[in-house]
Structure formats: C-alpha cells, structure tokens
C-alpha cells in the first residue's frame, strides 16, 4: 500500500468516526428532545424544498434521520467527496457513461465546440431533484439554442432498501447496469428534453464529480466554469441560469463593449 493510499484510508477513518459521532449525538438528542430536533430538521428541509413538497408529510422523512441507513448513506457521501477530481477552472473528468440504449460513451462526447454543457446529476428517489426538475426543464427550453444539457443518472439517493422515505418513488438499489437503466427510463416520463445517460456500476462519474445525491456543473470547452454545491441543501438550477446568461450570447445579439 502506497503512502497516498494509506493517507486516503486514514482520512476515511476520521470521517467514519465523525459521522458515527454525529449520528450517535443526533439519536440521543432526538430521544431526549424530539420536538426541538424535529423543528431543526424541518428548518433544514425548507432549504431543499422538502417542507413544500406535496408528496411528503414530515412523518414520511423526519423520523428516518440518524437511523443506521442514514449513517451509511451520509458516510458514503462523505467518503465519495474524497475522490472529487472536478475542480473549478480545471479540466472536467471525461468519465465513461452509458446511453439508455446500452451504448458506452464519454461525458466529453456531448461537448459541442464552445457551447456550454450543463451536467445534471441525480436520481428519481431524490426528492429535491424531482421537485426542481421543472426548473431544469425551463433552463433547457430557454437556452436550447446556445447551450447543451445532459442528465447523468446516478445511484439512488433514497432507495427502498436503503435510506428510504415513505411515499417516495419505489426503486431499490441498483444491483446491475440493467437496474440502473430501468430506473433512468422512469425519468423519461417527465420529458427531460435533453439526453439522459447513466453512471457506470463503478459509479465513476458520481465519484469524480462528487455528485451524490445530486449536483449541477457547467462545462465549457472541456473546463469547469461552474461547480454547484452538493445537494440536497445547495442544489439550485437557478444558479445555472445566472451562469448561462453570462456565457451565452442570445441569437441576433452582439456583445457590447
């Protein structure tokens, strides 16, 4: 084992202990002060839109916090961020992804000249991803002539056999590429109006872009010019709109100097 690999495992150990302490503390506080903890979780939910999501009542998701499933999911997300290779201003990782036909391709295959490419990572079991899906579709409509868009379907955020919410979309964790492709096909019912591909079963793009549970990026000429903060708390398609308004010149308009 090399020094860099040893250092990675040490960082993973530290994160494991941090998450374990956070979850244990949260569990104790939820037992002693259930109403206060519930109000704190609901306050966080306001930022993601969960409290405005008509599909979910608080009892569908608040009690799942600090469970063992919560622990493993949060740990996976924190560990994944150690693999982040998508730096603002740097070259975008040219990961392998899979079209819904089953054909392999790369992220860079969707870059067209100097047109910005928006990457939208998420899954059907991620409530904020679906809640804000119409916002994303409006971006596609408004900038279709000057930018390109790609949805990369990654592992489920709240799979039925993982950190599950009641009344959520019923999808189990992907055991095979076919499972992931079937899950991504469900997204087509929402008319995404842009290409949809899936991450590999090695979760390469999700890891290198630190995209779990959802995230937005903008790439131009192979470089990252916008790196959205991790979801669900900071997943914001309207930030992408502001970026595209600066990068894209509407047809028939000339820049003013």
Swiss-Prot record:
It is a single-pass type III membrane protein. The chain crosses the membrane at residues 13-33. Residues 1-12 are extracellular. InterPro entries: Iodothyronine_deiodinase, Iodothyronine_deiodinase_AS, Iodothyronine_deiodinase_I/III, Thioredoxin-like_sf. It is an enzyme of class 1 (oxidoreductase). Highly expressed in the liver, kidney and thyroid gland. GO terms for molecular function: selenium binding; thyroxine 5'-deiodinase activity; thyroxine 5-deiodinase activity. GO terms for biological process: amino acid metabolic process; generation of precursor metabolites and energy; hormone biosynthetic process; thyroid hormone catabolic process; thyroid hormone metabolic process. It holds the Pfam family T4_deiodinase. Belongs to the iodothyronine deiodinase family. PANTHER family: IODOTHYRONINE DEIODINASE, TYPE I IODOTHYRONINE DEIODINASE. Plays a crucial role in the metabolism of thyroid hormones (TH) and has specific roles in TH activation and inactivation by deiodination. Catalyzes the deiodination of L-thyroxine (T4) to 3,5,3'-triiodothyronine (T3) and 3',5'-diiodothyronine (3',5'-T2) to 3'-monoiodothyronine (3'-T1) via outer-ring deiodination (ORD). Catalyzes the deiodination of T4 to 3,3',5'-triiodothyronine (rT3), 3,5-diiodothyronine (3,5-T2) to 3-monoiodothyronine(3-T1) and 3,3'-diiodothyronine (3,3'-T2) to 3-T1 via inner-ring deiodination (IRD). Catalyzes the deiodination of rT3 to 3,3'-T2 via ORD. Predominantly monomer. Can form homodimers but homodimerization is not essential for enzyme activity. This is Type I iodothyronine deiodinase. It comes from Rattus norvegicus (Rat). The lineage of its organism: Eukaryota, Metazoa, Chordata, Craniata, Vertebrata.
């Amino acid at each position: 084992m090399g020094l860099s690999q040893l250092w990675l495992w040490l960082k993973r150990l530290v994160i494991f202990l941090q998450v374990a302490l956070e979850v244990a503390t949260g569990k104790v506080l939820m037992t002693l002060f259930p109403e206060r903890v519930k109000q704190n979780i609901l306050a966080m939910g306001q930022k993601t839109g969960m409290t405005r999501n008509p599909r979910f009542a608080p009892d569908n998701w608040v009690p799942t916090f600090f469970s063992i499933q919560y622990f493993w999911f949060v740990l996976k997300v924190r560990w994944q961020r150690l693999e982040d290779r998508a730096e603002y201003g740097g070259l975008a990782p040219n990961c392998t992804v899979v079209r819904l036909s089953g054909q392999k391709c790369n992220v860079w295959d969707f870059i067209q000249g100097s047109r910005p490419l928006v990457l939208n990572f998420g899954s059907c079991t991620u409530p904020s991803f679906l809640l804000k899906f119409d916002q994303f579709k409006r971006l596609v409509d408004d900038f279709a002539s000057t930018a390109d868009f790609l949805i990369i379907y990654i592992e489920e955020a709240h799979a039925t056999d993982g950190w599950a919410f009641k009344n959520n979309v019923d999808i189990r964790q992907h055991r095979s590429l076919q499972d992931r492709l079937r899950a991504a096909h469900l997204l087509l019912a929402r008319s995404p109006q842009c290409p949809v591909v899936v991450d590999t079963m090695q979760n390469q793009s999700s890891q290198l872009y630190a995209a779990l549970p959802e995230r937005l990026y903008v790439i131009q000429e192979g470089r990252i010019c916008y790196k959205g903060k991790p979801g669900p708390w900071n997943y914001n398609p309207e930030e992408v709109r502001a970026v595209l308004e600066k990068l894209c010149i509407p047809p028939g308009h000339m820049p003013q100097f």
